[in-house]
Structures are given as C-alpha cells and as structure tokens.
Amino acid sequence: MSEIEEKFNESSYGADSIKVLKGLEAVRKRPGMYIGDVGDGSGLHHMIYEVVDNAIDESLAGYCDLVRVTLNKNGSVTVSDNGRGIPVEIHGEEGISAAEVIMTQLHAGGKFDQNAYKVAGGLHGVGVSVVNALSEWLELRIWRNNKEYLMRFNNGITEAPLAVVKENIDKKGTEVTFFPSVETFTNIEFDFGTIEHRLRELAFLNSGVKILLVDNRFEEVKEVEFYYTGGIEAYVKYIDRAKHAIHPCIVVNTENAESGISLELAMHWNDSYHENILCFTNNIRQRDGGTHLSAFKSAITRVITSYLDTTGLNKKAKNYFSGEDTREGLCCVLSVKVPDPKFSSQTKDKLVSSEVRPVVENAVYTKVLEWFEEHPAEAKAIIAKIMEAANAREAARKARELTRRKSALEVSNLPGKLADCHAKDPAISELFIVEGDSAGGTAKQGRDSKIQAILPLRGKILNVERARFDKMLGSDQIGTLITALGISVEREFSLEKLRYHKVIIMTDADVDGSHIRTLLLTFFYRHMPELINKGYLYIAQPPLYKVKKGAAEFYLKNEQALQDYLIKSTINDATLILDDKERLVGDNLEELINKVVKFNGLLDHASKKFNRSITEILAINDLLNNKIFEPESDLRLKKALDVLNSLEDSPDKTNWEVLKHENKIEFFRFSRGLKESKILLKEQLESFEFVQISKFALTIFDIFSKQLKLIVKSQEFDILTPSQLLNTIIECGKRGINIQRFKGLGEMNSDQLWETTLDPTKRTLLQVRVAEIDEAEGIFSTLMGDVVEPRRLFIQANALNVVNLDV
C-alpha cells in the first residue's frame, strides 16, 4: 500500500467537512470579480487553475501525487487527480449530496473546515462552483467508496442528482470536464503556453507531484510532463539556467509551530545586474509582493549589515550600500504556506497578512546569516559583488548629476537628431525609433508631423544585459533615447513625464534590423518595464513586398501574404481536369489548393530530416509507411520513382533507383560520377512528421492518383504532384505583375513609408506584452547574456523552425 493510500482517511474529509456560504447568481452577473478579466484570456485560464488548485490542495494535505490536464478537441478541458475524491454523502444542512453543494453553491468546500485542509490555495477561495457557474456545461466524475459517480450541469444548474455509474472500482480521485460559456468569455480558446507555465510553476512548488498537460486539439498531440524532486531549489536553477551563479543555492525550510506558517526559500546571487524574486502564498503567485517580500528584503539587508560588522569587511567598503545593492543579481523563490492568508484584492496579487512578516524575517535572517558564517569563501564573493554594486550605483549617481547640470545650461535638452511632433498631449503623440539616418530622413519626410516624432539611432546600440547601469548611462544611443522619451530610468523612473504614449520600434526586416530590435527590447524590458506593462511599446510592421499590377499598387506584409495573393489572383481563371472528365473550379479548386498549401508546409518542415521530393512522391502514393517494405508495393514504388525522375530530369544526374533492406530503404543516383544516397529508416516512417504527412496525403490521394491537367487562361499544364500544382498556380499569378522586395526602410520613398507603416488608418503595429515575467527573464538572459551553452542549446532546439534565414 502506498504512502498516499495509507494517509487516506474518508472520515476526516466527509460531507460534514463542507461548510456553506450561499449564492451563485452574482458570479454570472459579475464574473470578473470572481475569476478575473473575461476579455483578455486571464479569467478563462483561471478556470483551469481553480480546478487544478483543488487537486494541488489535496496534494498539500498528502492525498494526491498525480494531476492531469487535458485540452480536448471540442474546446473543453478535463482536470483529473488521484486524491480522495469529492465527498458524495448527503450534506446535513442542505439535503443534497456534498458534491452538488460544492459545485452549485458559492463559498462551499472543505477549505472552510480546518480539519479537512490546514492550508489551501484555490484561486479566489470561492471553490469550483465558480467554474461551474461560468461553464456552458460541466461533467463531474468521482471515484470514491469503490464506486464511480457521475453528475452533469448546464450553466451551473444540476441536470440530475449524483448517480453511481460503476461499482467495484479500485480507484480514487476526481475528474472535472467543463466547456467555458461563450456568453461570459470573449474568447474561449485556451493557450497551451500560458497553461504550461502555470503547471510548471506548481510542479516546482510541490515537489514530488507529477502534473501532465495534454493537448488533443490538433492533429499533432502535445504532451508535457512536469515532475521535479528538487523543489524550489530546482526552480531557482531553472530560472537562472542562462546565468552564472557565484555560489551554491541557499535553502531555507522551516515552520513556525505557533502560527502554523511554513516557509520554503531557495536563493543565490548570480553575475547579472538584476534581481528576480518570485513570491508565493499557498502556491499562488503574488506579482505585487506583500508582507513576505518586505520581510525577506529587510532580512537580507540585516544579514549583510550584520556579517560586515562581525567580519570587519565593512572597513573595505568605499561607499555605503543600499538594500537594492544587496539584491543585485539575486534570484530567489520564496514560498509561504499560511492557514488563513489575507490579500489586498480578490486576484491575490499582494499578501497583506501582518502575521507573516515576523515569521519570514526572523527565519530568513537566522538561517541565511548562519549559512554565511558556515561558508566564508562564498560569503566573501557575495559581499564583493554587493560592494561592486554600491560603487556602480555611486558612479551612476554622479553621471546623472553631470547630465542634469548639462541639461540645465542648455536652451533645449531634446537631442538634435529628434524630429519632434507639434502635439504636446502624450496620449496622441507617437515616437518612431528608426535605425540610421537614411531611414530616419525618409520617415521625417513621410510622417504626420502633428503627432509623429522620429528618432534615428546611428551606431552600435549597447547590450544592456551585459552592462552595468553606469556604463549604460554613458552610451550615446541610450542617452539620446532616454532624453527623447522625457523620463529617467531605474530609481527615478516615472511615466508621468513620458512624452509619447506610443513608442514604436521601426527597423528593417533583415538580420541587422532584428538584432537592433532585440537590443532595444532588452533595454525597455530591463530598465523601463512599466512602458511595456502600460501597453506603450510597439513594433512597426513594414511590408516586405510591393506589388504593381497595371496602375494599381499595393503592399504585402510577408511571404505568406504574397503567396495568398498570387493564388487568389489565379484561381478564378483556373480549371483542374481529372482523367479528362471531372472538373474542379472556383470554390472546389480553392479548397484543394488550401489542402495542398498545408501539405506543402508539412513537407517543408520534414525536409530538414529527409529529401522533400522523395517524401512527397511516396506520400501521395500511400508509400510513406510500412507498406513500402511489402513486395506487393514494388510496382507502385517503381511508378512513383518514374514520376519523380520525370520531374527531376537532368543531364548531369542519373535517375533515382532504390534498394530495399530489412529495416531501411536506400534511394540513390549518380551526379557526374559521384553517388548521391538518401537512407530512409523504418523507424523514421513511424515518426510524428511522417505519420502526419502520410495521413494528410490520404485526403488528396484520390485526386492525385488520377491524370491531372491544369488550364489557366487557355494554357495547359500536366500536373503530377501537389507541389507542382501549387508552384504552377503561383507562377501563373506572377504574370503581368511587378513584385518588389524591400530589404530596408531606406528603399521606400516617403509616400510609400507613410502609406504602409506610418498611416494610423492603414498600418499594422504589434503591441509588446510580457505574459510571464520569469519566462521572459529566461529568454532575455539566454539570448543576450554571457553564458554561451544555453544560447547554443536554444539555437539547436529552434533551428529547424526557421523558415526564412537572411544571410
């Protein structure tokens, strides 16, 4: 019997454990008060988190070690666990099953009974009833008492009482499947990445609990497992995986018997210049901190002060250090478990429980100071970093004072390169940051000078990820940008003086432009995060192509838009004839072309691993599977190769031939005496990419097994493969038009730039948002930091996803 089964005690968690505080109608009337924003996706995802938090609460109580979240094809979500199962007995006060009480009445649940749960999360403490109230339908399955129970709800209303559907079941747990209400939520499509981040967070915070996330919505099934035995120490290492830690992790794990408050903490200093502290209460993240964060900061400052006084190292300090100096480069995960936590709002973004502060401050001070005393060499390295931070802060202060004195003597302290706008209202003013004087000149001519300002940046932009604050202030480009914006950075940061409420990065669509954009994004993320949080930072989307047909001119954003245009311009004049009989035109032909486009995308992706032409010809002949090894398929394989050879006819190359082996097939030919060989392994045929291609090919198999002839404006083409059909359609679309590809903004004249990128009524802007702070932290550190290995691994992992590489 497992430890979890041994702990199982139904008598301690029964119907009488459920305390009731009634009322659900308010949830449907004002859902935002209970579940979060119903328009931006946060409330939608909180529906999942609420159910998952119930399962995690079971694990905190010691009864659950497996949680599974499944995104279903029909748009619903299933959350299951192997906990005790929701109580099913008739509730004494309500006269209905405890399960129905929990699902239909607000503020009902075991969390209100201290004997059932000592500590609990639960998104807003309102129970899964909120999820039920805001779901079009919900299905509840419970495994308890060796039985399986089932109950269904529509818009929070019970369809029928809880019923036993199976008996003699050796299983315990709860499963909730729900479909969000389209009347409540603006968008009901769940984002895999958002859910993945939260579940990974929970797995780190609850060491030993396995959490599975499965996405069944698409042909490509995604499955991710989160299981960490290292707890929050492993979490700190994960967050800081792209940085150099200057010492091993400091771990604190303690509980205050009197208050029942427990503390878990893992922290280390790294060689970066930014602090990163994540705070949790009962597994819920407090993005705005609170009493636990204040206590931690105070304790760390006290530790450093005390250690300096004790060791005499303070005599070597050139400058007094501040609390911020002690936290430069500090990465910490702080998790407290509190029996009855209090928060500043229902979204629980800030902890206000005053009793938490002394517990955390005393524990952190005692344990961390003890660690310093036991590890003098590591402590010395930490102190050296803090002193260096204090010196840099002092140098930055002097640099700011010098800048202010210079500004006070100038008639106008706006940079000379800035072509400012006439408007003084920041709400309607826009600043375009462009690379180089050439693009800057064109932008100045094409802009609306009433509301649009242009700031050209010339020369190399500093990578602030690798630079101290004082060095950053000395950078000409960064200094120019700060002055133009009208605000300072770091400790003096205030959006009140921001001169533009749209700050738009406008760079070329090549590698250099991408690099400059990344450097600017790094600066804003590190030193002006509020600009991003308020939604003031944007990225311009200049077009990649200009298309001219007769007197008409228009612009296309990217390769995909160009392809779509060329297909649509041809499709109305095209007819596909099948076996000299059936004809595909109009919508039917367009439907086929859309399938071919998707098929081509699958082939492009798989071409990184095997020859594209061979893959395609095998797929449309139903041979991209184990059938290819069967003798009965030899004739079909020969015909397929004949088609391939007719398409790739070249005087320098011989025809493709094939050799079958037990577990592989070799395709080979000779080019000027040299053998070119492609090996297809049997195991490759079972890979996800090939299975996906093979299945999709069956949807167009009937058409491409026939003799095809494409007619476009009386011109005829014999068609043998999907790629040939698509390429012919595209080439026909190019006739009579002129296509110009822009490599840089400087290639556009001022009218073109206005029409495509500057005109507020026509342009496309991407608003910069940070969905998950610690994920963004990891990405910036990986791509822009000093550590090479994580960057190399990142590039290796994503190299095959590159579609267009500008070299």
From Swiss-Prot:
Listed cofactors: Mg(2+); Mn(2+); Ca(2+)
Domain Toprim: 429-543
Pfam families to which the protein is assigned, alphabetical: DNA_gyraseB, DNA_gyraseB_C, GyrB_hook, HATPase_c, Toprim
Compartment list: Cytoplasm
Annotated site location: Interaction with DNA: 460, 463
PANTHER family on file: DNA GYRASE SUBUNIT B, MITOCHONDRIAL (PTHR45866:SF1), DNA GYRASE/TOPOISOMERASE SUBUNIT B (PTHR45866)
Extra remark: Few gyrases are as efficient as E.coli at forming negative supercoils. Not all organisms have 2 type II topoisomerases; in organisms with a single type II topoisomerase this enzyme also has to decatenate newly replicated chromosomes.
Protein name from the UniProt record: DNA gyrase subunit B
